[in-house]
Amino acid sequence: MSLTLEQVKRIAHLARIEISDDEALTTQGHLNGIFQLIEQMQAVDTTGIEPMAHAQDVSQRLREDAVSEGDRRAAYQAVAPEIEAGLYLVPKVIE
């Protein structure tokens, strides 16, 4: 798969990116290079190879979840300008 110059310009337009002809040509080359790499990767025969989640088979040592602070909701809401029913009230910014 490869992109034409017109397709690159259309994608830039849809993304609301202003792009010159030189930049579009450079971007076309970069994107087509990425697509070629993807095609090469898809051409590799991976039958019989088990998918892996990580490059190295290492497990993490995890600690137990423990509460490190108590409930401080009342202290935080005591300094809030406005609260109602336990919720913070903020000014309306979208009409």
UniProtKB/Swiss-Prot annotation:
- What's its job? Allows the formation of correctly charged Asn-tRNA(Asn) or Gln-tRNA(Gln) through the transamidation of misacylated Asp-tRNA(Asn) or Glu-tRNA(Gln) in organisms which lack either or both of asparaginyl-tRNA or glutaminyl-tRNA synthetases. The reaction takes place in the presence of glutamine and ATP through an activated phospho-Asp-tRNA(Asn) or phospho-Glu-tRNA(Gln).
Keywords on record: ATP-binding, Ligase, Nucleotide-binding, Protein biosynthesis
Recorded family membership: Belongs to the GatC family.
Keyword Manganese (UniProt): no
Q: Per the record, what are the reactions this protein catalyses?
A: L-glutamyl-tRNA(Gln) + L-glutamine + ATP + H2O = L-glutaminyl-tRNA(Gln) + L-glutamate + ADP + phosphate + H(+); L-aspartyl-tRNA(Asn) + L-glutamine + ATP + H2O = L-asparaginyl-tRNA(Asn) + L-glutamate + ADP + phosphate + 2 H(+)
GO MF, one annotated term:
glutaminyl-tRNA synthase (glutamine-hydrolyzing) activity
Q: What is the lineage of its organism?
A: Bacteria, Pseudomonadati, Pseudomonadota, Betaproteobacteria, Rhodocyclales
Can you say what this protein is called? Aspartyl/glutamyl-tRNA(Asn/Gln) amidotransferase subunit C
Pfam families assigned:
GatC
